[in-house]
């Protein structure tokens, strides 16, 4: 006979303010099989857990139902409490009466009635629960970092420092990411290259770190502790083991007019190139779209001048397969495409530039050697207008993103300050909606731009930019003075919104990781697990999870590394016992379950069965690897014969819940 105990949590006032918890406990106490029911302000507290353990012993409970918050919050807490009292942890059910009840209802009577129904369903299910025992699986002591920007670099360095092997996969020819294109960092105006390049070199020289530059993740299989990853190393047409990075090939290549993506198309490069002087690895790459030798078999200059014999025109993509215990997504961001905003004339005038393009124009290693010149005629601009929030904080009717990009206010202040410092005769205007400076020393930095450098900050919107007579006619509004402004500018700089890298969606699909509506990776919990994805063993680092500046990115990178280290320190992991279980007598070998399994946990075997008249039959049936199965339940839905069931969530248990709800 089942002996169920019910414990209703107030969660302070989170539940109790909307749900009559006393009535819920009293009502559920009369359900069949329930021998004890009570309520308490905080069931997750030590006192609450002690109460559960005491009542298990006192009433010889065979099952426990906790009416509280989401099982994602405290299911493990309550399972461990019950296990200490000698009750199998899988004889515990959580009725979510906070997120699914009190938080979404205002009427107390309705919320209370719903809480009773949810509790009744949990009671019906727990009576059909069976004790489950978790198995173990070994942990591969190696980590994969997808993305080689500052987030990926810091994550890899921290993991390697703990003594674990780590691979960085970067799709571009060099690691470093967007930070390599930045001149100075706010609010201290440190040289970005002086901070970043030593870390890049550390990665290259660290024996525990292997860099797969100019490579992409092809596929991901397996599960936490045992991921199987295929990496595509794209053909550089240069042997990395032979190339010395001398640059002779890049100097002699006759194809000189290739748009230079590192300088955002503000100048050109050769068909064979090294992105920038401090690139890691410092290895040349041949651009197959522009190389005459690869396109029509004519040229070969780079091979002739390469004394190391590193040029290999026949090189092909290669696939590398590797096992990993943990994966970190550090895929970074891209500025939003600005040509969609016609009002700013970005695609009509070369003197309307993005903030990152302006960064390159101010950089000593940029296309103009750090001299600020207009792209159209090479003249020094006397009047510059900065426009904030281009593509950020847009409502549903506007083009762009609905979120704040977080870094635009600060880097615009930096650009304006550096411009005034270097060219005091330049008039600088900044049009803004709000100035957001929440970081340490950020507000002081912004005030310096206004008070010390005389930058004109105007609260208002730029309505239109019109190229006319060699000038940019800026039409804008000043909301504080309630007037319209017309400024003849020489340059307009647009603070472009940032969005996730284009590869993020495909990477998330391979990792079975969740994403929000803006294609940022979703964390397991925004407060308690901010660097973990809901997929076990997959962690988040940097702007793949949301907009952030460099200090915040580095901090999150180290936090993600700490989580990875904690995982790799273990010799084995406890497996989820709630795995799929096929009924071999009902299985017809159709492969439907195998096709939908995202983890590759299902295979098919030929098995002997005893037939009529002592005959032997060979039938093809499904077999589940419990170490790989993550208990998602996709196979149970797909199975046409009903042969596949899920431990802990069987069809019988789910129907018992449905019947209880409909009662």
For the regions a protein language model found, what residue spans apply to each?
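Residues forming the flavin
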Residues: 1-663
